[in-house]
């Protein structure tokens, strides 16, 4: 195509759009950071958008080989419920207006982290059927802590960059035969943590089954603390990419539409 002839579209349902995926029917699936809608529209007819109610604060979106869609959600309900025992920062009122910029959003998120030092989970992963029905909404509940990026591997299992959880979460997909014995769709297979996995955002699988993940932050407190942190003052930004060798089912790249195994 000719990129100079592109057009900006206003799509009903979008509010701070974040993740994008395209399925085999050429439908575009888009999450929104600032509402509880997953928006779906034909690639050749963006004016015919439909929405699905999900939990407030959508992030990464991925399509598996069967057309099911997986979405990272940063809260515990469509209304943005917090986990038991969690509280909002004192300077953020109830029903606060949405942040105006991504940095304001990060600041609010970091304040939530500091206000709740004993909380270890917030958010979960959702599974949507090809006919746009919610199949499961609370996947990885208890493990997910601000889940961010989502990728599907060649076994149709799911990988999530678990930002505040500082981990890579491996989830059994829609083909339990490809999962360890006793695991079924939506079960956490393993939650990978190590000294090199920091505050992770996006994650992707290559043709050899290696998992690549982005360390976005290193030390969350250093990122937002207004006072000098001494010897840790340079620990703000994350330290590059992490490759976890051979843990995922190989994927045919480049990824165009639903995930595919290498030929």
Roles of regions detected by a PLM:
Residues 1-263:
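Flexible "stalk/tail and boundary" regions
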């Amino acid at each position: 195509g000719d990129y100079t002839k592109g057009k900006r579209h206003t799509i009903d349902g979008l509010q701070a759009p974040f993740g994008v995926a395209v399925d085999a029917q050429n439908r575009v699936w888009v999450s929104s950071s600032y509402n509880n809608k997953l928006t779906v529209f034909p690639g050749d007819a963006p004016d015919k958008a439909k929405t699905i109610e999900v939990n407030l604060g959508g992030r990464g979106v991925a399509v598996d080989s069967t057309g099911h869609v997986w979405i990272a959600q940063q809260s515990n309900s469509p209304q943005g419920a917090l986990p038991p025992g969690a509280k909002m920062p004192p300077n953020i009122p109830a029903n606060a207006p949405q942040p105006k910029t991504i940095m304001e959003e990060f600041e609010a998120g970091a304040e939530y982290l500091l206000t709740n030092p004993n909380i270890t989970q917030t958010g979960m992963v959702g599974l949507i059927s090809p006919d746009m029905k919610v199949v499961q909404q609370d996947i990885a509940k208890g493990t997910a802590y601000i889940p961010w990026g989502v990728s599907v591997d060649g076994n149709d299992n799911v990988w999530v960059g678990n930002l505040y959880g500082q981990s890579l979460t491996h989830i059994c997909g829609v083909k339990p035969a490809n999962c360890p014995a006793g695991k079924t769709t939506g079960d956490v297979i393993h939650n990978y943590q190590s000294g090199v996995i920091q505050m992770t955002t996006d994650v992707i699988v290559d043709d050899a089954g290696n998992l690549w993940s982005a360390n976005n932050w290193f030390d969350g407190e250093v990122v937002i603390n207004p006072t000098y942190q001494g010897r840790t003052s340079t620990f703000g930004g994350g330290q590059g990419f992490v490759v976890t060798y051979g843990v995922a089912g190989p994927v045919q790249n480049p990824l165009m539409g639903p995930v595919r195994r290498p030929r």
